[in-house]
């Protein structure tokens, strides 16, 4: 699978994919990354890719022309074009799995400033996506997050298939069971005895019993629990 990134900050993208599991997956041929500097398609000597807003308003917009040229430069390798934007549909694991199943290249356009000329959204983009109800200073982080979520679903990315199958958001209604590592007791906090028993049937039963239901949007109780707890 191929990920194309149209960005003003190539080093930011390159840095993320140059270490850890991402780097190993690229070296193993699981997926590839193509980073495109949008300024190379500015069409002016100052490499400007933004301009003021028609009708007035604060800030600047990315121009449609350089974005269009950058997409055209990819030819058949453009695949699905995704604009990261606060006004996009909320990205989730189901979308990640659908994008992985499609197998097409993904081209990410990172938003900046006040956004992009609406003609980009209207004529050049297949999907407009958001990470949530908040605003980032640049769209690169959102592009990286989406690519990361899709790439780790690809065959050969994770060492153990069981790890992927057990992950929380690959199941629609449940979270993972609690997991522990050494030491078996710390600060008076103990690992459940059943997990130390070596009885695989009992361990499996405990894990199934202790899978957690997803509580969507219940962040108020999470914050309260955090505030009430001490370290």
Curated annotation (Swiss-Prot):
GO terms for biological process: tRNA N1-guanine methylation. GO terms for cellular component: cytosol. Disulfide bonds: none annotated. It comes from the Bacteria. Its main location: cytoplasm. Gene3D superfamilies: 3.40.1280.10, tRNA(m1g37)methyltransferase, domain 2. It is found in: Cytoplasm. S-adenosyl-L-methionine binds at residues 111, 131-136. It holds the Pfam family tRNA_m1G_MT. GO terms for molecular function: tRNA (guanine(37)-N1)-methyltransferase activity. Belongs to the RNA methyltransferase TrmD family. This is tRNA (guanine-N(1)-)-methyltransferase.
